[in-house]
Amino acid sequence: MHVVLPDGKQLELPMGATALDAASAIGPRLAQDALAATANGELVDLMTPLPDGASITLITKKNPGDAAPLFRHSLGHVMSQAVGEYYRAKGYSDDRIKRGVGPSIENGWYQDFDLPEPLREEDLPEIEKIMREILSRNLAFRRREVSKAEGLAQFPHDPYKQELIQGLPDDEPITFYQQGDYVDLCRGPHFPSTGRLPGAFKLMSTSGAYWRGNEKNPILQRVYGVAFASQKELDEYLHQLEEAKRRDHRKLGRELELFTIDPLVGKGLPLWLPNGTVLREELAGFLKEQQFRRGYQGVITPNIGNLELYKTSGHYPYYADGQFNPIEVDDEQYMLKPMNCPHHVRIYASKPRSYRDLPVRLAEFGTVYRYEQSGELNGLTRVRGFTQDDAHLFCRPDQLKKEFLDVLDLTVLVLKTFGMNDVRFRVGTRDPESDKYVGDEANWELAERQILEAVDEVGLPYTIEPGDAAFYGPKLDFVVKDVLGREWQLGTIQVDYNLPERFDISYVGEDGQDHRPIMIHRAPFGSLERFVGILIEHYAGDFPLWLAPRQVMIIPIADRHNEYAEELRSELHAAGLRAEVDDSSNRMQAKVRTAELSKIPVMLIVGDKEQEARQVSVRERSVEGHKERKGVAFDDLCAELLERYRARI
């Protein structure tokens, strides 16, 4: 057999040769430094037989980060071994320690356990200590294949491993990996030995997780760890994590009184508090203004609909698992609205349409409901009830590209208005092997081609993601990177030839015949809840003036200045600005501190001098730090703030 090296040269090897054999054939130093390899683009360990003719790249200690998924997975096994040793030292037998799944994930790994007593967060440093001791033993990772019967016999007291093994094919070998006396069911691959693993790791947290994600199954304890090729990378990651905690929208949402989630109301159903409502309405107002300029018409639809509506659209039963169960009313079935588009189609169909009427652009901030498992709910970014900035455009074929480009322009404008300039674009197309898609083959091909033509025309960088399309049509997603470098999918545009067919809608063309319109789905924010959650973290709660729920705090130095402060508040309020007076008995420094903690962007301090001259001392928060100005004429400042507010800066 032979393998192909990165420089294109072929290396002859005996049949069944491994990556380690390839490294040894090149030279003993390379064999000593090798950690893993890629074969035809897939990571493999050094002991796995290579396919004949495979293109291989050897990964060495000079570039261990290239093998990050391997060393993270191997460290997961080391952690699992350490947990076993920890509980044995406490007097528990091995059959009391049961394990679920333990994959590598982004930046690390997790492992699910069923333990005789729960691990506490304060136990994790001790587990880390045992892990480092296991690394020092330099235990080899050994792969072996066994039959299904042998596999079941390996874990007689572990129902989770038994279930996993029972689900494997009878006629295929089962692979185990072993280091020292620890054995686990695993496909691999792994590092050569524990001594070759990086020491830049940390156990982060524990949580509960249903076995196999099913709420009817037992809750296991999930332990998370992270690992990097170097301590510098780990330190940078931990610093970023601390910054993410500081910006956590759930924490800031409470502190800034933006939203709350009340268990009596229900999980995943946020309540918008007055401050959060202001923020939400500013977002909606901004988009409505843009939509008005572009010829959109507002509509309102109910929060429930007849089940037949969603059967016609195809949302039911295609996404039945993600929707709330139907309810029966007057011998008919209804369900909470999972999407706005079928309702908008019926509005389009409510009267005859001519080619002269098109395009029809219908927009709504419509609340929809999806059933998310409770373990997946997360503040505002994963909820069960949310409001989409939904619009649906109905157009002729000759109008499609122009309408698509206009929607694309609007979405980019929205994102850049909020400082989200690092944007990439993702075109979701069909997976030809999947049967989840509905509609005519020719229409799918046409829609996919026209999306790509539109994106090419504006010169946007993009990737094509097969299988990422909606069930009714291809789409363009906008992926933004926030200040922490995290990527979020915000905004989507979808071309849909399918729903017009399913609902049999039409317009009368110039030829007097009925024609089928093309439909575009569009939501620049995606959902207001998720967008607000991301904005809170993007700005760390320090919103620009126009978005800030509390824009101006007037701070009188003494009680005798309260009347002047209230006069200024009244004038700012009349001008359309959100202003308050802190007339508490606290000292001025304490009032400033309170306003700082509330992240109010503008503070106006007034004392004797300011009152006599109708002036204010200004203290502003900004990303660059604090800016202070003294002796500013109030009328000039009011005009300045109003101009900034209207310009949305």
Swiss-Prot record:
InterPro entries with a match to the protein in the record: aa-tRNA-synt_IIb, aa-tRNA-synth_II, aa-tRNA-synth_II/BPL/LPL, Anticodon-bd, Anticodon-bd_dom_sf, Beta-grasp_dom_sf, TGS, TGS-like
Listed name of the protein: Threonine--tRNA ligase
Ranges where the TGS domain occurs: 1-60
Function text: Catalyzes the attachment of threonine to tRNA(Thr) in a two-step reaction: L-threonine is first activated by ATP to form Thr-AMP and then transferred to the acceptor end of tRNA(Thr). Also edits incorrectly charged L-seryl-tRNA(Thr).
GO biological process: threonyl-tRNA aminoacylation
Keyword Coiled coil carried by entry: no
Enzyme class at the top of the EC tree: ligase
Sorted UniProt keywords: Aminoacyl-tRNA synthetase, ATP-binding, Cytoplasm, Ligase, Metal-binding, Nucleotide-binding, Protein biosynthesis, RNA-binding, tRNA-binding, Zinc
PANTHER family for the chain: THREONINE--TRNA LIGASE, CHLOROPLASTIC_MITOCHONDRIAL 2, THREONINE-TRNA LIGASE
Cofactor(s) this protein requires: Zn(2+)
Region (Catalytic): 248-544
Subunit structure, interactors included: Homodimer.
UniProt remark on cofactor binding: Binds 1 zinc ion per subunit.
Compartments, record wording: Cytoplasm
Similarity section: Belongs to the class-II aminoacyl-tRNA synthetase family.
Gene of this entry: thrS
GO MF annotation terms: ATP binding; metal ion binding; threonine-tRNA ligase activity; tRNA binding
EC numbers, comma separated: 6.1.1.3
Main location: cytoplasm
Reaction(s) the record says it catalyses: tRNA(Thr) + L-threonine + ATP = L-threonyl-tRNA(Thr) + AMP + diphosphate + H(+)
GO-annotated cellular components: cytoplasm
Alphabetical list of NCBIfam families matching this protein: thrS (TIGR00418)
Residues noted as binding Zn(2+) in the record, renumbered to the chain: 341, 392, 521
